[in-house]
């Protein structure tokens, strides 16, 4: 039997909130997809990692709006903008660039990201 499942981020299965941002999750077909929404001034090491140097979650995603930087532990730095499809290996920090909120969809790593944050 074939099945169709429709979900929307307006009614997510889970929301992980933290200062200056949130990460909404939908689960379907054995997969977890996340939508990250970060306000200007958000930085992973300050607002999610709580002082940790690096995010150790592997990400594949798509930038919907805004801009963000990913800084790898080896010194490489990239800026992501709307329409970019990205892969980010473990061992990075990230922050919002500019005065516009940053929104991205995450197809890999969503289930592990910001797990210990209060709901």
Predicted region positions:
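A short, N-terminal "cap"/entry segment at the start of jelly-roll beta-barrel domains
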Residues: 1-37, 45, 119
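A short local loop/turn or secondary-structure capping micro-motif enriched for an aromatic residue
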Residues: 42-43, 79, 112-115
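Conserved GNAT-family N-acetyltransferase fold
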Residues: 36-38, 61, 86
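Short acidic-glycine-tyrosine-enriched beta hairpin
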Residues: 73-92
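Glycine- and acidic-residue-biased ligand/ion/polar-headgroup-sensing regions
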Residues: 31, 49-74
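Short beta-strand segments in beta-sandwich/barrel cores
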Residues: 43-44, 66-71, 94
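Short, acidic/polar N-cap/turn motifs at the starts of alpha helices
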Residues: 13-15, 22-23, 33, 58, ...
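A short hydrophobic beta-strand segment most commonly corresponding to one strand
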Residues: 35-36, 88, 93, 98-117
